[in-house]
Structure formats: C-alpha cells, structure tokens
Amino acid sequence: MNDKVFETLFHLDVNSRVEKKKTGNTQLSYLSWAWAWAEVKKRYPEAAYKILKFENNLPYVYDANTGYMVFTEVTIGDVTHEMWLPVMDGANNAMKAEPYEYQVIKWTNGKRDGFTTKSVDPATMFDINKTIMRCLVKNLAMFGLGLYIYSGEDLPESEPPKPATDIQINGIKKEIERMAELAGIAYEKAE
C-alpha cells in the first residue's frame, strides 16, 4: 500500500495551490495545510496525524541556543512518518524565547559598507501553531504530496549576488561600444 499511496499523492498536481512568500533573497513555496490535509483525507479516509507533545504536554521542544522545534506524525495505512520543523521568522531565522540580534552585510551604493544589525522577535504561540501546521504539510510531502516543492531545500543558501564594480561596469560599457561599432549600429551613451 505504501508505494500506491506515494504514487497517488506524488502525481497529484499541486501547482495551482502553491503559495509563494519572498523574504530577502529567498522565495519559499507553501501549500495550505487545510487544502493538503483535505486532499489526503479524500483519498485515504483512514489517514491520521498527531502533534507530538513533550514536557508539560507542550507541542514543542526548546533549546536556548537553537530555538523552538515542533514535530508531527502522519499515519496512512500501516506507514507512519515523523517530521520536524524549527519555528522561524519571516526571514527564516530561528525564533527563541527572547529577542536577539544578528549582523548582516550592509551594502551602500552597490558597495560593501560594513555590517548592519537585524533583530528576531521572540516566538509566540501563533508562530508555534503556524509552524506545526507547516510541519504537517512537510510531513504529508514524505507521503508524496507536493514533495517536489521541497527540492533544493537542503542545499546551502547562496550568497546574494555582489553588485558590479565601477571597473566591471566601465568594461561592459566599452565592450558594448566596440560591438556597436563592429555591427555598424549607432550607439548613444547614457550618462
């Protein structure tokens, strides 16, 4: 049954249901938990999910250094998959019990200009609840539903492109002028 479940859910086209969220240089894709769960239940009415709870019956674990983490389990037939997800802010920074700051490169007029400080707010129960439901959707992806959305998630984040230097810009302008001359095209310099 497991292979049949995966094949069925993996081949379900979710493209029209993907929501995109851009923060900084990162664009993330999401599926609505309500839609994802409804699609699974339509096909597998016996499917069940569980939000794992820990000390004091809390639906998360917390570490002062790394932040909050939530866990879900989904069972379809005789197969259970567990999934976990850190509680993150809109810029994908781990949220903790207390606010904290971090440094990022500051760019001024296309040039690196030291560092600037950004902050991360403390997690709220709303943040934790939102993450639990995103964790559920990620858990459903382990059964095939929208799995391709997570392709590349495990790759390291690339650095943002560095702005071109004046030397590079002038070199490109000279090359454009040279090519225009070779092609016999009038080229008007923009200043």
Predicted feature residues:
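Polyanion-binding surfaces on beta-sheet-dominated domains and ring/shell assemblies
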Residues: M1-K174, R178, I185
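Amphipathic, non-membrane alpha-helical rod segments
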Residues: Y187-E191
